[in-house]
Amino acid sequence: MDELIWEKYPYLYETHLHTSESSACSRSTGAEMARACKEYGYTGIFVTDHNWGGNTAVDRSLPWDEWVDIFALGYEHAKAEGDQIGLDVFFGYEAGYQGTEFLIYGIDAAWMKDHPELVKATVEEQYCLVHEAGGLVIHAHPYREEAYIPEIRLYPEWVDGVEGINATHSNPQSTGHNDPQYDLRAVAYAREHKLPISAGSDIHGTHLFGGGVAFRRKLTSVADYARAILTGEDYVLTDGAKWYDKFGNVIEGNR
């Protein structure tokens, strides 16, 4: 990481992370992910496991409250470990709609239990529900092309921002979904609709890429993160290999 950028923006957050307790595609537990991220130098992480509409590890036939309790275990284990080692851990999830996915921030498991209608909510209804709770909806990797994504669908009116930098697309260490064009198109889409841009690693194991969003100050909560993104606070983005300004432009001279 470039030392000058690191000095100006010392608080790095992983915004897209999966755990094996809750995401069927993840290889590492919440506690293992927390330890790896702390060792890497992250200030905090957002646990964003796949929900019922995506690659969840939780039995969809369970009663709703029980499903939520088990779904939250990845976050809870990461949070318990983070509290011990000095890593901030925040709750979120990745909502799936036949391959189109959204990162949800600013709500918690208790709120989910109170809103079982989430399971059948449309993209538009999801946005309204999350907003009523003061949350944030980010369109995850909108231009990724994979077998599990039958078509690219865009919802600029029903998101608060776009994950323009996804480290699995652009970090040289990535062995899956690796195509920088996905990010270039996502950034262009965000600019066209004047939507804030975020970054994350979409990480599923302890071999970290180092992607995320870095701030000049330490975040106090998920709500604080939402405010920072929505109000245009000063931050930078990274895929772990390059740094970008908040508009998705490569910061020249970084390494």
Enumerate the language-model features and the residues they cover.
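Well-ordered, non-membrane alpha-helical segments in soluble/globular domains
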Residues: 65-78, 119-124, 179-183
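Short, solvent-exposed loop/turn segments at secondary-structure boundaries
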Residues: 23-28, 59, 114-117, 174-177
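An N-terminally biased module of ancient metal coordination in phosphate/nucleic-acid-related enzymes
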Residues: 1-97, 205-207
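Glycine-rich tight-turn/loop motif centered on a GG-T
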Residues: 64-65, 110-116
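Conserved beta-strand positions in the central sheet of alpha/beta enzyme cores
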Residues: 45-47, 138-139, 163
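Charged catalytic cores and adjacent phosphate/nucleic-acid-binding surfaces used
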Residues: 1-15, 19, 30-35, 98-110, ...
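Extracellular glycoside hydrolase catalytic/binding regions
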Residues: 142-145
